[in-house]
Amino acid sequence: MKAHINGIDVRYTVTGSGPWITLSHSLACRLEMWDEEVKHLSKNFTVLAYDSRGHGESGAPAVPYTLDMISDDIKGLLDHVGAMQTHWIGLSMGGVFGLHASLKYPGLFETLVLADTSSKLLPEGVQAFKDRVATVKASGMEAMVEPTLKRWFKDSFRAKSPNLMDKVGRWIRTTPLDGYIGCSAAIPTVDVTDRLHEITVPCMVMVGADDIAMPPVMAETLDRHLPESQLVVIPDAGHLSNLEQSGAFNSALARFYKHY
């Protein structure tokens, strides 16, 4: 399905019934990143998955993207589907978006799951985004496929998961150039560590133990500053922990949501 939200068409799916849960994917991915989570969560929840601005089959205008703009995308989509409040699961970029939207729209999220993400990037992380933007401007998205897979997944997992690597590689390769550039400019502007105390809903911070893109120290910072938080470190997982250790990721979600 698609809806015209905040000036762009947004592709989304709604599955199951019960309280709302919204799933927000990583940079250069798409809503299919959440297929396993949709399958599990839709037994007890109404699950909204969507392609973020600039990704998948959603609009990718060649304009500057901001976290405020993306928060408005989220609020507009939730209004469109009739979700007054939702649980939020965001991984990497999706976690950044969830943090910003929760501060811009207090009360919108009943809980937050923040996976492999951060409330503020280190200077070298900001520079890395600038370098990747320069690369795709010069050479296109194909130049991002192998470096991104290597950064996101451990070599041992890549070697035994060729079909998944092909799939994720296609997601990266087909991400609209303007969307990748736009979101890569917006993400590094996140700087909300000093405001995390304002997010008083229950949170679960998750991170792959071997994540080098958003390492565990960033998750520990989130967990330390959020008033009601629990930290789950997923062994033997890199950046896309829901794909590398699907069983452990979904078991943690099941424990977190058992009271909702």
Predicted regions and their residues:
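Flexible "cap/lid" loop of the alpha/beta hydrolase fold
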Residues: 99-104, 108-139
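Conserved HGGG/HGGXW glycine-rich cap/lid loop of the alpha/beta-hydrolase fold
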Residues: 8-60
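Catalytic active-site module of serine/aspartate enzymes centered on a nucleophile-bearing elbow/loop
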Residues: 229-260
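Active-site loop/oxyanion-hole signature of alpha/beta-hydrolase fold enzymes
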Residues: 36-39, 48-89, 251
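Conserved alpha/beta-hydrolase catalytic His-Asp/Glu region
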Residues: 120-127, 139-197
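Gly/Ala-rich beta-loop-alpha elbow adjacent to hydrolase catalytic centers
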Residues: 90, 94, 98
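Short beta-strand/loop motif that positions the catalytic acidic residue
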Residues: 199, 205-207
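Acidic catalytic loop of the alpha/beta-hydrolase fold
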Residues: 209-214
